[in-house]
């Protein structure tokens, strides 16, 4: 499987997920309209910043939505990403706030939307529902275990919340 990730939102969480995907050897494209997102791109060699959600997700099979924790914004970004991404693309929402069912409820393909949850000690858990097919759950679990292993090797800012994500969208 080609590992092409799209990171939507380059605040603290988005930058950390982009770093993990790059460290795992993935091709990573990102979208964030905020001018300060350019600094994240400068810190991450190999990250390609795109001008639109459409161009960021065009070839992605794994999309991480890390926009500020506003439900309407998350729903809008998930809908747009699914409208433009390949049919099989998985959308992982990195939000500690909203229930996965609220996020899936707006999706074009709700069975391909899940939530990433950070756990104490640097782990990553998946929040899924019965809408997610067993094979998708298995694939997502494998990929998140790989990323969690990389997270455990160093200081990971995805677990820190200084409000930076609120400024990036």
Predicted stretch roles:
Residues 38-41, 81, 103-104:
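Hydrophobic packing residues within well-ordered alpha-helices of enzyme cores
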Residues 8, 31, 50, 66, ...:
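Structural motif
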Residues 163-169:
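Interdomain hinge/lid region at the active-site interface
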Residues 4, 12-13, 17-21, 29, ...:
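P-loop/Walker A phosphate-binding loop and immediately adjacent motor/lid segment at beta-alpha junctions
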């Amino acid at each position: 499987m080609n590992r092409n990730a799209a990171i939507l939102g380059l605040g603290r969480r988005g930058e950390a997920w982009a770093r993990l995907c790059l460290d795992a050897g993935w091709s990573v494209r990102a979208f964030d309209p905020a001018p300060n997102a350019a600094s994240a791109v400068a810190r991450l060699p190999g990250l390609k910043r795109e001008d639109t959600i459409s161009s960021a997700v065009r070839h992605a099979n794994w999309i991480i939505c890390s926009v500020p924790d506003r439900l309407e914004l998350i729903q809008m970004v998930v809908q747009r990403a699914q409208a433009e991404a390949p049919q099989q693309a998985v959308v992982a929402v990195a939000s500690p706030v909203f229930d996965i069912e609220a996020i899936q409820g707006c999706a074009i393909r709700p069975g391909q939307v899940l939530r990433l949850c950070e756990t104490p000690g640097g782990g990553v858990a998946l929040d899924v529902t019965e809408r997610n097919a067993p094979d998708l759950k298995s694939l997502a679990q494998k990929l998140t275990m790989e990323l969690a292993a990389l997270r455990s090797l160093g200081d990971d800012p995805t677990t820190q919340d200084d409000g930076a994500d609120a400024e990036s969208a």
